[in-house]
Amino acid sequence: MQSIILIGKPNVGKSSLFNKMARQRIAITSDISGTTRDANKTEIYIHSKKAMLIDSGGLDESDELFKNVKKNTLKVAKESDIILYLVDGKLAPDDEDRQFFYSLKKLGKPIALVINKVDNKKDEERAWEFANFGVKEIFNLSVTHNVGLDELYEWLEKFLHQEFLIPDEEENLEDFLEYYEEGKEFQFKEVDQNHIRVGIVGRVNVGKSSLLNALVKQERSVVSSIAGTTIDPVNESIVHKDKVIEFVDTAGIRKRGKIQGLERFALNRTEKILSHSQIALLVLDTHEGFNELDERIAGLVVKHYLGVIIVLNKWDKSEMDFDKTVKELRLDRFKFLAYAPVISVSALSGKRVHVLLDKILQIFENFTQKIQTSKLNTLIENATRAHPLPHDYGKLVKIYYAVQYDLAPPKIALIMNRPKALHFSYKRYLQNQIRKEFNFEGVPLVIASRKKGSKENDES
C-alpha cells in the first residue's frame, strides 16, 4: 500500500488535515504549538484508491525533543511514496521552511507545498510569496473551512495505484490456514442463498427513490425534484424467482461542505447500510452527467467489498451513446469497477428496470461462488507457466498452491515462498485469468499472498 506523509513545522495544521482526510478525529488538534509529537497513521481512501496517511511530528529546532522528531520524520519521508509539506499561510515564508522543503525535494518523490489557513483574500495574496520555493505543485487550503481539498485530492490520485484486488484485511485467513490441509476442500461460512441485501446508493437527486418504487412496483419513498428528499433509509422486500431481495433506499450523498444536520446524519447511515449490504446499485444520472462525487461514492462500494451494478438512470432523457458511455466508465471514471455490469434504465417510466432483478440474482450467485481447489490450482499452474513469475533479485519466486478461503466476496490465498515479491501487476494478471475462467462479473476478488509455514499474512 502506498503512503502519504504530512510534514511541516508545529501548528501549521497537519493534524487538522490528517483528521479531515481520515474523516475522523484521530490526531489531537489545538492551538498549542507542537501538540503532535509522535507520528500518527491511518488508512484512507482518495476517491476509490487506498493509501496509508502518516501525520509526522512537527519539524522544529527549538528543543532537543523536536530534533529527534525531525530526524525520525525525515526517515519516514524516505520510506513514504508522496510528501505533503504544510506551511502556515498567515505567516511569511522563512528560510527554515525552505531548507526543510529542499531537503525533501532531493528524495525524488512526488512532493507538494500545501499552504494552509488561507481563509480570505488577504491570505491568498500572501500565499503568492511561497512561489519562491520553486515548486509547481502548490495548493492553497483552508482545512477549517473545507476549501481547496478537492484539488489536492485530484493531484494525489494521479500518484496512487488503483488496486483491482482488494487487500485482505481480515484475520480469517490465518484462522482458515491453521486448520486447512493442502488439497482438501473447505467448509465455508453459511450464507443465506435465498435472501439478498441490496443497497441503492448515489448522489442527491439521481433517482434512487424512483428506482426503488419501480423495483417494488409501489410508491414507498417520497419522490420530489428537491435535492435530498429522502433522508431516512427505506427498506422494502420483494420475491423474485423464489429469492427474497431486500432493497434499502439510502439518502443521497451531497458534496462536502453542503452536508448539514439531518443530511450529515443520513450520510453516516448510508455508510452503515453499505456495511450490511451484499450488493450495491450505484445509480448515476445520465441526464445531468457524471462528476467527481460519483467516483467517491463508487469508492465507498469498493471500500465495503460489495457486489455492484452500475445503473445509468434517466436514460430516456440522455443523448449519450451506450457503448461509448460504458467504455468511458470502464477506462476512465470507474476503471476500478471494470468488473461491474452497466445497465441503462428509466426509473420513472419503468423501462428496463426488470433487467436489474435478474442481474441482481446473477451477481449474488457470483458473490457467493465456491471454486474447487483442484480447478483453481490447475488455472494458477497454467497461468504461471504461460507467464512465469518474475525473480526477486535473482531468487526464484514460487506459488506452492492456491485455495479459496472465504466467500461473499470470494477470497483466495496464494501460498508462496516469497509473498512480498509478488508485484501488484502480476496479481492483477492472475486475477484476470481467474475472472476469465470463473464468472466473477460484478464482484470484487480478494487475493492474499502468504508465506508457507509462516503465521504472518504477507501482502504486497
Curated annotation (Swiss-Prot):
Instruction: Respond yes or no to whether keyword Nucleotide-binding is given for this record.
Output: yes
Source species, domain of life: Bacteria
As one GO molecular function, the record gives: GTP binding
- Keyword Nucleus listed? The answer is no
Q: What is the lineage of its organism?
A: Bacteria, Pseudomonadati, Campylobacterota, Epsilonproteobacteria, Campylobacterales
Subunit: Associates with the 50S ribosomal subunit.
Please explain the role this protein plays, according to its UniProt record: GTPase that plays an essential role in the late steps of ribosome biogenesis.
What's the protein here called?
GTPase Der
